């Protein structure tokens, strides 16, 4: 099993959610996040004063899937989240050793 963590622009969330649904993934976790990379921050003007906004709003999506679905899911995220501009985000893929559904006690792929 694999865990896919994707950090994307917030306005791309619905497109990514739909793309994941199309490859057969239904359950995702979404967390509002702030961060910066190469995009860095920017300067804003508020009531006549300039200030630097270091951290930009992002959305972090987490999904656990079977190994054979992972590459299709990553491609779906890339295609749905890409704008071609700096700040489109990152995708991290890691191995998951175990999954347990708390309600039933199911383990492994049955618990996804």
Residue ranges and their predicted role:
Residues 1-112:
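Positively charged, small/polar-rich N-terminal and surface patches that mediate targeting and assembly
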């Amino acid at each position: 099993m694999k865990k896919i963590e994707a950090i994307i622009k917030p306005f791309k969330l619905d497109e990514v959610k739909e793309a994941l649904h199309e490859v057969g993934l239904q359950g995702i976790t979404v967390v509002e996040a702030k961060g910066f990379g190469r995009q860095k921050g920017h300067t804003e003007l508020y009531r006549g004063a300039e200030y630097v906004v270091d951290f930009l709003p992002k959305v972090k999506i987490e999904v656990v899937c079977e190994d054979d679905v992972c590459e299709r899911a990553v491609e779906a995220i890339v295609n749905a989240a890409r704008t071609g501009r700096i700040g489109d985000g990152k995708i991290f893929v890691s191995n998951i050793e175990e999954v347990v559904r708390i309600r039933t006690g199911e383990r492994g792929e049955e618990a996804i």
